[in-house]
């Protein structure tokens, strides 16, 4: 059975949960708390599975996969009964480009761990402006 290590507030993990449900794949959610003061993802057991110590992380038998886009591609290629991608080009490439825009251009710049670092190292006001700029730029292109 597929096992997804996930945190309920993680948008990256949410992407994978959506795909698993759209594809109607039987899976187990393994909660991994990223909450301050708990930080299960930094524990030795999780670090041994996933040295990056992030969610999502998918296990399929002995195979472990990190990073939401890699997981989505794996699910699409290996569980193709209910495809997520359109059947033809250029639609497939457009969907992939949209996914990459979110996962690579918007999400990393606005990730909570990145924003917390910026707010700690710099003032909150510039960090908030930085966040607003990248969200606006990314979603304007997506629209």
Predicted stretch roles:
Residues 1-126:
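GST-like domain detector, emphasizing the conserved glutathione-binding G-site
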Residues 128-143:
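Amphipathic alpha-helical packing segments from all-alpha helical-bundle domains
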């Amino acid at each position: 059975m597929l096992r997804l290590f996930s945190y309920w507030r993680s948008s990256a993990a949410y992407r994978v949960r959506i795909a698993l449900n759209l594809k109607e794949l039987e899976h187990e959610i393994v909660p991994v708390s990223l909450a301050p003061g708990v930080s299960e993802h930094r524990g030795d057991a999780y670090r041994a599975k996933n040295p990056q110590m992030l969610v999502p992380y998918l296990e399929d038998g002995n195979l472990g996969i990190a990073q939401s886009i890699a997981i989505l591609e794996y699910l699409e290629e290996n569980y193709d009964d209910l495809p997520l991608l359109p059947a033809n080009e250029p639609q497939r490439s457009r969907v992939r480009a949209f996914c990459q825009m979110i996962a690579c251009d918007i999400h990393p710049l606005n990730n909570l761990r990145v924003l917390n670092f910026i707010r700690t190292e710099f003032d909150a006001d510039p960090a908030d402006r930085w966040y607003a700029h990248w969200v606006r730029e990314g979603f304007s292109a997506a629209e």
